[in-house]
């Protein structure tokens, strides 16, 4: 049985479609979202809370905010879940926009060195004194391939890549096998026109604020998670920290969140477009029609294995 992978940019409609597909295929969903792994962060990560009542979901609420979780850990945990789901006679459906996680699962990551906390803390201290850009430029010089794949403010990933290079002399990208897939899978890429997607992103940010995102950010700050919330990774959270602290207006924070989410979507689109997966245009099909099409593609692929 092949696994089904449904990917695409943020706010495209992955969760709604995956929920429909999972019910029709008797599947279970494995989330490939680098923010959904964190507990207490429901609104800003758009966790599919309604669908979670109907379909079993995995790799959501795994660690506390700021807890260590990377693509290698995701690969190992996702593989375990895939085997567990298959043993039940159900279809494993991987859903998300974090392409580094999807890439790790499908193509594998060689064993990377264990964390060196002393070195890591020194690198964080350098970033505190000299800024994220300073470390990002260092990473670009030693590992341009990996630097291209991550955001210049994603300090956690920058520090990890530098840490590995300093300890091994090898670029972090050399631990990734990006040639032949190690898993038998059917890939579905969801797309929309830029105008349509950007409108959905704008609406989603406003909806999240309406649903209580600012209150969620305030609660997380009270719990002591400010360092994580202001990291480059925490899109739709970091933008609202100044607002929660009374340093910016709500409208300013909303505009910043929309701008950063659109940038993230562009990076995701660039990666998914290159994969050669089956493309589903959600501007032309309703969720129900797209669901039927994905089910057909998946069943046909399993007939010809």
Curated annotation (Swiss-Prot):
Kindly state which reaction or reactions the protein catalyses.
Answer: adenosine(37) in tRNA + dimethylallyl diphosphate = N(6)-dimethylallyladenosine(37) in tRNA + diphosphate
EC primary class = transferase
For ATP, which residues are the binding ones? 8-15
Q: Which GO terms describe its biological process?
A: tRNA modification
One of the record's GO molecular function terms:
tRNA dimethylallyltransferase activity
Any idea of its EC number? 2.5.1.75
Q: Where is this site: Interaction with substrate tRNA?
A: 98, 120
Sites binding substrate sit at 10-15
Spell out where the chain crosses the membrane: none
Output the HAMAP family linked to this UniProt entry.
Answer: IPP_trans
Q: What does this protein do?
A: Catalyzes the transfer of a dimethylallyl group onto the adenine at position 37 in tRNAs that read codons beginning with uridine, leading to the formation of N6-(dimethylallyl)adenosine (i(6)A).
UniProt name for this protein: tRNA dimethylallyltransferase
What is this protein's gene name? miaA
């Amino acid at each position: 049985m092949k696994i089904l992978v449904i990917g695409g940019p943020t706010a495209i409609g992955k969760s709604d479609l995956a929920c429909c597909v999972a019910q029709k295929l008797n599947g279970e969903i494995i989330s490939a979202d680098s923010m959904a792994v964190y507990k207490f962060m429901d609104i800003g990560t758009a966790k599919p809370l309604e669908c979670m009542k109907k379909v079993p979901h995995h790799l959501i609420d795994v660690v506390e905010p700021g807890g260590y979780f990377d693509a290698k850990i995701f690969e190992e945990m996702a593989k375990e879940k895939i085997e567990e789901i298959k043993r039940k006679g159900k279809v494993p459906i991987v859903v998300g926009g974090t392409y580094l996680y999807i890439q790790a699962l499908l193509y594998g990551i060689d064993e990377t060195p264990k964390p060196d906390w002393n070195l890591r803390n020194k690198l964080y201290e350098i970033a505190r004194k000299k800024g994220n850009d300073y470390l990002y430029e260092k990473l670009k010089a030693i590992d341009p391939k990996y630097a291209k794949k991550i955001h210049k403010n994603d300090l956690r990933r920058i520090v990890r890549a530098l840490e590995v290079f300093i300890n091994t002399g090898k670029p972090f990208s050399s631990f990734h096998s990006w040639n032949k897939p190690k898993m038998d899978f059917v890939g579905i890429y969801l797309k929309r026109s830029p105008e349509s997607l950007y409108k959905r992103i704008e609406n989603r940010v406003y909806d999240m604020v309406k649903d209580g995102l600012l209150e969620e950010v305030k609660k997380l700050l009270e719990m002591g998670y400010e360092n994580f919330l202001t990291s480059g990774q925490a899109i739709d959270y970091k933008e609202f920290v100044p607002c929660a602290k009374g340093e910016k207006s709500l409208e300013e924070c909303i505009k910043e969140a929309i701008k950063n989410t659109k940038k993230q979507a562009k990076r995701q689109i660039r990666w998914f477009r290159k994969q050669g997966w089956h493309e589903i245009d959600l501007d032309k099909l309703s969720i129900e029609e797209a669901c039927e099409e994905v089910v057909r593609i998946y069943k046909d692929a399993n007939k010809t294995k």
